[in-house]
Amino acid sequence: MISHLFQTYGRRTVEFVKGNGTKVIDNNGKQYLDFTSGIGVCNLGHCHPTVMKAVQEQLNDIWHISNLFTNSLQEEVASLLTENIALDYVFFCNSGAEANEAALKLARKHTGKSLVVTCEQSFHGRTFGTMSATGQNKVKEGFGPLLPSFLHTPFNDIKALKEVMNEEVAAVMVEVVQGEGGVIPADLSFLKEIETLCKKFGSLFIIDEVQTGIGRTGTLFAYEQMGIDPHIVTTAKALGNGIPVGAMIGRKELGTSFTAGSHGSTFGGNYVAMAAAKEVLQVSKRLSFLKEVQEKGEYVLQKLQEELQHVECIQNIRGKGLMVGIECTHEVASFIEQLEKEGLLVLQAGPNVIRLLPPLIVTNEELEQAVYMIKKVVCTKNVSII
């Protein structure tokens, strides 16, 4: 069949037609354990019953009107997002790139400065602003010239950061765990130093929680575990559990810099997205739920260490909560292909890291099942090494 799609994705040939919880079924009836969650989107699993009910009920009332009118659902979701954290205002959009774009615009508008510092191997989006912020050349090839006034320093390198910080820096944007960059957690000392330097030079501290947010690491936002106080936090992906929605969350003091007409979104905060986000947050914010995520994260890391520590091609196992990276000594594309054949869907994070992003509702039994499937594949000698 001739495709009329731009070939912007390296698609696998399998096509899925049904999903439920942690499982998906392809068009041949084969069932898979999904440890991708749509790249960290379906944190509550596929077709979560109460999220589905909330969306279905909203579809019977009103889908979309305009942000020129009052929307009480937006207020409810904003309250859920800012509850128990030192952030006050929310701007709703449709994706992580849009949330980060809003953060960059707000930082420049509020500070009156233009220079933004991010990290090498970071990923912040594919719009011109967020692509310029991203610290990976492969994302930018062929699209230049990019926006000026973006600097990239090595992740977790305090010395390099200090060398570029000055009064001209509007903001520092960083991920608590670099997802696309290899599932690499930020050092606490690095995040603390960013906070200190931002205070010193009057810069905004922006945390990108597009992939780590909404419970992925065992707290609603990963930064909450680090004892830091950012000016802005961005989130998306799991906020709608598959319904497109993103959010930029900022301190009250930034509110006067985004006035009527200064920024906006046609679809951002629409009723259907807000219905999904409200239910997602009501489920994800439960302390018992978050505690289970922490426990499952510890459990799967322990099981992976036990089963893979003596496997020659395994170089490192790391992660935070249910965001796990298995670093290998060589490229992992063949492993991922073989795991798919075995019935386990996983992701890459760079050329040599297997990334696991299971739904947060995953059971210990399913985690064990995945670990043994991974062990089987990485220990199979006839798996080709690219």
Swiss-Prot record:
EC identifiers of the protein: 2.6.1.11
List of residues that carry N6-(pyridoxal phosphate)lysine: K237
Binding site for pyridoxal 5'-phosphate: G96, A97, F123, D208, E209, V210, Q211, T266
Catalytic reactions on record: N(2)-acetyl-L-ornithine + 2-oxoglutarate = N-acetyl-L-glutamate 5-semialdehyde + L-glutamate
Pathway it works in: Amino-acid biosynthesis; L-arginine biosynthesis; N(2)-acetyl-L-ornithine from L-glutamate: step 4/4
Binding site for N(2)-acetyl-L-ornithine: R126, S265
Other facts noted in the record for this chain: May also have succinyldiaminopimelate aminotransferase activity, thus carrying out the corresponding step in lysine biosynthesis.
Record key words, sorted: Amino-acid biosynthesis, Aminotransferase, Arginine biosynthesis, Cytoplasm, Pyridoxal phosphate, Transferase
Gene of this entry: argD
Entry's Gene Ontology BP terms: L-arginine biosynthetic process
PANTHER family: ACETYLORNITHINE AMINOTRANSFERASE, MITOCHONDRIAL, AMINOTRANSFERASE CLASS III
Record organism: Bacillus anthracis
Cofactor needs: pyridoxal 5'-phosphate
Description of how the protein assembles with itself and partners: Homodimer.
Any single GO CC term annotated in Swiss-Prot or TrEMBL for this entry: cytoplasm
Localization of this protein: Cytoplasm
Family: Belongs to the class-III pyridoxal-phosphate-dependent aminotransferase family. ArgD subfamily.
Co-factor: note: Binds 1 pyridoxal phosphate per subunit.
Class in the EC hierarchy, top level: transferase
Keyword Ion transport among record annotations: no
Name of the molecule in the record: Acetylornithine aminotransferase
Family annotation (InterPro entries): AcOrn/SuccOrn_fam, Aminotrans_3, Aminotrans_3_PPA_site, Class-III_PLP-dep_AT, PyrdxlP-dep_Trfase, PyrdxlP-dep_Trfase_major, PyrdxlP-dep_Trfase_small
One annotated GO molecular function: pyridoxal phosphate binding
